[in-house]
Amino acid sequence: IGVNAKEIIDEAHEAQAWNLELIGRTLRLMSTQMTTDLFGDMPRSEAYESNSPHYDTQESIYEWMNQEIEELIGMYEDPTYTEAATNIPIDQSIDRVFAGDLNKWKHYTYALKARLLLRKLPNWENNAATCQAIITAVNRALEGWEDVLYRFDGGNGAQNSPWGEAFGSTEQGGLGWEGRGNMLNSAVPTKYFMENILGVFESHNNLKGWAEDPRILAFMSARPGPSGTSDSGTEMRYLDTNIGMDVSYKVDNYPTLFPEVDGKKVSVYTQNTGYVPLFLEEELLLIKAEATYWSGDKPTARSLTMQAAEINFDRFNLSSIYGSSYT
């Protein structure tokens, strides 16, 4: 992302194509935060200048990101940049996320600001001013919010979602050195994911379903066990991490991660026409809930958390999966 963004930003700046520069810098900021949150210190100020660039401290990188986000927001709010005659036409073929709509990119940038500021809680600058700044950024983002999604049309090769069934069985996924298959056709859910995250029950419950988390049916479908054994029934099986399956079992005895209900694919992520989410409304609401909690308003924090959960349930179409039994 960084190399491509640098080329876009440099060439756009030279041509005064401010709309393209804004999009490129926003993506660079997103990528920088994701990378430093994972790895800590990293090259930034000297990135791409040599084979052994200086490693900037994570603290200095956050200082740069906080400055960059304010400059970006200022440019998004300034018609001198957003309506410049030198801006280039940007459509869906260039911008797969918002088709060049800078208003939508602006609200995404406010969301990134909220994500940046959240890092100050609870141990860095946990005070009323920080909490209010986060809440304000979230509110500005929500004023014109649209989920930030990279959508796939389906078809051949890279036209399919990287988590789609097209890449489920092969290591390379048909993309050669450019990509890898997701191997979900041979993946088995872990004990931690099933028990600690989803709260799976020992067996299906006619009233409660398969797990505490009703999204389980949007993630996977149960499959029968080995025929001729005492465990031939249809169950949500799983394995402990790094523990192999018994010799009588095959991958087909464990849940499929390309779930179906009444013969219809239901996962929003593992379909070939799925999407990669860059920022969702649920995250915005949870960020606001966190800030509201630390500001002392726990009832509102709880309400926001519940609202985020409901939106996520709607995202996974639970009402259509469960039908009349879903409440």
Residue ranges and their predicted role:
Residues 1-287, 291-307, 311-315:
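Structured, solvent-exposed acidic/aromatic patches
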Residues 314-327:
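CBM-like carbohydrate-recognition segments
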